[in-house]
């Protein structure tokens, strides 16, 4: 249900805070030497991780996306422009203001994180077709319709998926009890999220052993 993702309950806020704290603890992903080699002429070449640049995020509903994306982009050194759905407009606006306030307090340019505080859908079209000089990549986060629109119209490079890609695979050596619990959790813990399992793949040698029990648990 879309309403589930919009509820700003104490638990949801606590989960968002915990998510931010986990991101803070992650190692800096930039300026890491991923690979290096020496050419026959003596030239040393290094492959180093760097920020992508300005990232545009177009997403629907969930306010937690605002906090997660803002945190991840700041952690990775990528300025971000956020365009959230109208369903959670005011929650997103408040969250973005809190992030900007925190940046300013810590003497960081608050414009590192920007939120488009306009509800009109034409803003999305403008981002996709008129901002190629200012945005390096656009990432859509939402339903199939949104992702397809972004991929069809964008003059900016995009990172996204069109069809569902969430699979759960059970190998032939898997513990049946654990496998059943994992598949059940992946599919039914929260069916509203885009990360819920859509396809279950079973190794042919384990189908007879666990197939029916998995299906039965999902049906119940």
Predicted regions: what they are:
Residues 1-13:
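Short, small-residue-biased leader/transition segments that mark boundaries at the very start
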Residues 17-36:
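Membrane-anchoring hydrophobic helices of lipid-metabolizing enzymes
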Residues 22, 40-47, 114-132:
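A structured beta-alpha segment of the ubiquitous adenosine-cofactor-binding alpha/beta core
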Residues 30-102, 106, 154-160:
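Conserved small-residue-rich beta-alpha loop and adjacent elements
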Residues 61-64, 68-79, 98, 105, ...:
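ALDH superfamily catalytic-core signature
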Residues 82, 114-117, 139-142, 158-161:
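General beta-strand structural signal in soluble alpha/beta enzymes
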Residues 100-116, 136:
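A glycine-rich helix N-cap at a beta->alpha junction
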Residues 125-137, 149-152:
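Active-site/ligand-binding-proximal alpha/beta "capping" segment
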